[in-house]
Regions:
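Outer-membrane beta-barrel domain signature
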Residues: 13-19, 50-56, 89-90, 98-103, ...
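Residues that define the transmembrane beta-barrel architecture of outer-membrane proteins
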Residues: 21-25, 59-63, 106-110, 143-149, ...
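Repeated loop/turn-to-beta-strand initiation elements of outer-membrane beta-barrel proteins
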Residues: 35-41, 63, 69-78, 84-89, ...
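Transmembrane beta-strands of outer-membrane beta-barrel pores
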Residues: 43-47, 71-73, 80-86, 132-138, ...
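Predominantly the C-terminal beta-signal and adjacent terminal strand-loop region
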Residues: 191-236
């Protein structure tokens, strides 16, 4: 439900262990029951354009399996992701140490997502989106596992129809457990946030001024940041 205002990190309930925004060869199957339950399986491959082939022992690939329940005002889902031969889409939003060895043998990831929204827009209550990810590595030089999270709030139709206020915060994938011999490495807690207001001057234009920032973003040094951006979308 949360719609990001500036940062890719807050897409998909957190751009993290199981999901990615890059493109690759893939296929998927979805079954949705009338009672709100749904399940899906997707397969992605990066070897289709090379010599590795698709879904071979050498293919850089990922298989996601998701179970979800959606009602009018809330949603719950869990996704299991099996990744092999250096699948590294997760490393885009990870700390320096966690992403330092993206050519891992394999990884098992779990992504938990939930959202709730009020019955009507224009309420003082925001919609709430939560995401938590954990990933375990086989063959990583530094990490046994890592985790990250996000929380996103949206208020709609607050000052005028079709406007949106957004506020989100979260952490990139950061190492929880180091491999033997790398335990002396200490990561600082990373944190990233954004705030924005989106409105429509008319039916064809949407304007979104946003500010964003973070502390210890890469977790290996005090690398804080702060910035702002104005996005204007035209539809004809």
């Amino acid at each position: 439900v949360y719609k990001p205002g500036a940062l890719k990190a807050f897409k998909l309930g957190g751009h993290s262990s199981a999901f990615g925004a890059s493109t690759s060869v893939g296929a998927g199957l979805t079954y949705a029951a009338d009672n709100g339950f749904a399940t899906s399986v997707t397969v992605n491959s990066k070897g289709g354009s090379g010599n590795a082939g698709i879904l071979t022992a050498e293919d850089e690939s990922k298989i996601n399996t998701q179970v979800a329940y959606t009602a009018d005002q809330y949603h719950l889902s869990v996704t299991y992701s099996k990744q092999q031969n250096g699948w590294d889409a997760w490393s885009y939003y990870a700390t320096t140490d966690a992403a330092s060895d993206s050519s891992i043998d394999s990884a098992d990831a779990y992504a938990f997502r939930a959202w709730w929204r009020p019955q009507e827009t224009g309420s003082t209550l925001p919609s709430v989106s939560l995401g938590y990810d954990v990933i375990s590595f086989d063959g990583h030089d530094l990490a046994r596992n890592a985790s990250g999270y996000m929380v996103g709030l949206n208020w709609q139709d607050t000052f005028q129809p079709d406007d949106r206020i957004g506020l989100a915060g979260g952490s990139a994938l950061a190492i929880d457990t180091h491999v033997l011999g790398a335990s002396d490495l200490e990561e600082m807690d990373p944190f990233l946030w954004e705030a924005y207001y989106s409105f429509r001057p008319n039916d064809s234009i949407e304007v979104t001024p946003a500010i964003f920032g973070g502390s210890n973003v890469e977790a290996d040094k005090e690398d804080d940041l702060f910035g702002g951006v104005i996005t204007t979308t035209f539809k004809f």
